[in-house]
Amino acid sequence: MRADTNNYRELFLRDVPMLDTRAPTEFSKGAFPGAVNLPLMDDAERQQVGLCYKQRGQDAAIALGHQLVSGPIKARRVAAWADFARAHPDGYLYCFRGGLRSQISQAWLKNEAGIEYPRVIGGYKAMRGFLLQTIDDAVAQCGFVVLGGMTGTGKTDLLRQLDNSLDLEHHAHHRGSSFGKHAVGQPTQIDFDNRLAIDILKKRAAGHDRFVLEDESQAIGACSLPFELYRGMQEYPVVWLEDTTENRVNRILRDYVIDLCAEFVDVHGPEQGFDRFAERLRQSLDNISRRLGGERHRQLAGVMDAALAEQQRSGRVDAHRAWIAALLAQYYDPMYAYQRQRKSQRIVFAGDHQSVLQYLRDPPAVGRALKGFP
């Protein structure tokens, strides 16, 4: 039998399949990419056992657990574990702390199905701690550069052309603005942290010690940036991406109208998908109504409604350009101009897509001497 392991680094670097024996509620609050939840106890059973533990102690709780998970219930769960183990002979199982639940699952697999399957020592809690430490270690040991720029300049597009980028919006499944929600919701905070940490771990293992990330506020939708990373982002050098207003409008039209509408249609079907997309767009504008002011909000909402009606009627999207351009000129550009002014002392380079890409791939010697360019 393969030995139990506490080599968390290798588990995540190799995307090792993992069988999570925690209850569904625990799993839904946060897990690891690729982990499969095949619980020893369901939520109701776990609640009963937990109450018994508090009232009558560990031995009584264990006895109740064996009583609740017995007969056909036990057989079905062992069969599911056995199927997983056969499909993933290189995998491991775990519970919350690497204690009784994973040990019992191990024993049942061996005794009932004849399969010896290793567990993760320390379980979910230890792996979660390892990933959080991975982020803090990177902040302390690596260099970081912040990619800034006006809305629609294509910062995310550029990041995806770099091997050493950390795409925070990708991990958060949110574009980082009032209009940033996708058709499908965001991961939990724990899942966001875990995905980011594994990304960092793999890139450091590939030899990267300098990372580029997009300028973000502390929260990307419902996901908050790790505290030490966000604090560092207030000090890291900034590279500023520039583009024409026309290109920016085209890019926003692509991301927030064409692609977003397609997402909703894929998830909900043509008719309901378009209705939900239109409602999301209107709600996003409503979210900034107070900052826009009542009259300006009403004007933009009217232009947006007309564009949505034209899109639904004919499939044409050009009418959206009017409210996009107005929103840039009246709201986003003044806000970003103020932010650029505040960051002016940290801006080490500014240019168009190609020049910024070249700079970030091969920063000059003077840039490497700055904090963030080790």
From Swiss-Prot:
Active-site annotation: C95 (s-selanylcysteine intermediate)
Q: Which GO terms describe its biological process?
A: tRNA wobble uridine modification
Matches recorded under SUPFAM superfamilies: P-loop containing nucleoside triphosphate hydrolases, Rhodanese/Cell cycle control phosphatase
GO MF, one example: transferase activity, transferring alkyl or aryl (other than methyl) groups
Name the domain of life. Answer: Bacteria
Arranged from A to Z, the UniProt key words for this protein are: Selenium, Transferase
SMART domains from the xrefs?
RHOD (SM00450)
Catalytic activity, reaction form: 5-methylaminomethyl-2-thiouridine(34) in tRNA + selenophosphate + (2E)-geranyl diphosphate + H2O + H(+) = 5-methylaminomethyl-2-selenouridine(34) in tRNA + (2E)-thiogeraniol + phosphate + diphosphate; 5-methylaminomethyl-2-thiouridine(34) in tRNA + (2E)-geranyl diphosphate = 5-methylaminomethyl-S-(2E)-geranyl-thiouridine(34) in tRNA + diphosphate; 5-methylaminomethyl-S-(2E)-geranyl-thiouridine(34) in tRNA + selenophosphate + H(+) = 5-methylaminomethyl-2-(Se-phospho)selenouridine(34) in tRNA + (2E)-thiogeraniol; 5-methylaminomethyl-2-(Se-phospho)selenouridine(34) in tRNA + H2O = 5-methylaminomethyl-2-selenouridine(34) in tRNA + phosphate
InterPro entries noted in UniProt: P-loop_NTPase, Rhodanese-like_dom, Rhodanese-like_dom_sf, SelU
- List each copy of the Rhodanese domain by range: 12-136
Q: What is its EC number?
A: 2.9.1.3
Instruction: Share what the entry says about its subunit structure, partners included.
Output: Monomer.
NCBIfam families in the cross-refs = PRK11784.1-2, PRK11784.1-3, tRNA_sel_U_synt
Which family, according to UniProt?
Belongs to the SelU family.
Function text: Involved in the post-transcriptional modification of the uridine at the wobble position (U34) of tRNA(Lys), tRNA(Glu) and tRNA(Gln). Catalyzes the conversion of 2-thiouridine (S2U-RNA) to 2-selenouridine (Se2U-RNA). Acts in a two-step process involving geranylation of 2-thiouridine (S2U) to S-geranyl-2-thiouridine (geS2U) and subsequent selenation of the latter derivative to 2-selenouridine (Se2U) in the tRNA chain.
Give the protein's recorded name.
tRNA 2-selenouridine synthase
Q: Which organism is it from?
A: Bordetella petrii (strain ATCC BAA-461 / DSM 12804 / CCUG 43448)
GN (gene name): selU
